Amino acid sequence: GKRLRPMLTLACARMCGYEGADHVKLAATVEFIHTATLLHDDVVDESAQRRGRPTANLLWDNKSSVLVGDYLFARAFQLMVEPGDLRVLDILSNAAATIAEGEVLQLSAAQNLATDEAVYLQVIRGKTAALFSAATEVGGVIAGRPEEEIKALFDFGDALGVAFQMVDDLLDYWGSEATGKNVGDDFRERKLTLPVIKAVAQADAEERAFWKRTIEKGRQEDGDLAQALALLEPSLDGLARAAGALRDALLQVHCQAFVALAVVGAVVRRNRDDVFVVGILLPRPLQPGADDAEADGQDVGVGQAQLRDHAL
């Protein structure tokens, strides 16, 4: 894995001037929570591959995966109380609960073509962005920063988490082995992610019947994934533009976070290396036609290579 979430905790704490060692324990806590949810998710989804490798439940069994996930959750709670900060405990324990709530909401919304973008955003804010925002927020809390700075760090983590999950869902249809994605898993698991939600909203009667058969009723046949990709392709440019717009919003939140930190002037200057670490975690903008345009410079849309490049 990429260890993005614990890296955020470490970098944000140092960026805020923290000089102790408890941020390492909190970073480990964040990663333990994340890994535990992955182990449980793979059991729920009956997944056979993650990050291009066989899942634990495939290599061993569901019982082992669930028990190891439970152990990691328990260790996470042991670690999060060690700094002796009740607010840190509140943030991380709430994040763990919110992740579970997000997964339950996703399960209840699955296979339901009535699921819209508002529900989708609620799901990804729960199951993904909650841990990103907790990871950045505790960095400011443990450093004893003012409330406006802590709020800015929370907003930054929330926006980054939403962007991360949106791009991850795009890559499930337009990714490759290089991104560690097993293309089509969400389709086979009948998940209503943003690409399908967009396609269903624009579908005619015949296309809607296809999505109803494959997603709602689960009657999938050979060639259905290829047909799904063909139906999704017209919305690719719009989805990429949406991701680019989200990235712009994320950059704005990023700047707001650093403006808040700059209230203390010397903090950002003294910890500029950690500011850089946080900055490079941002996805690059999606530019229409960058890898598909012909020599004459014609804008012919956003290509799959760009989406692969945005895997975090």
Q: What are the roles of these predicted feature ranges?
A:
Residues G265, R269-D273, V278-P283:
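Short, strongly patterned local motifs
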Residues K63, L92, A266, V302-G303:
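Glycine-rich loops and low-complexity Gly/Arg-rich segments
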Residues L67-G69, D309-L312:
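Short C-terminal domain-edge/linker segments immediately following a structured domain
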Residues G1-V253, A260:
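All-alpha prenyltransferase/terpene-synthase fold signal
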Residues V253-A257, R272-F276, P288, D292-V300, ...:
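Alpha-helix boundary/capping motif
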Residues Q78, A130, K191-T193, G244, ...:
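Sequence-pattern detector for short linear motifs
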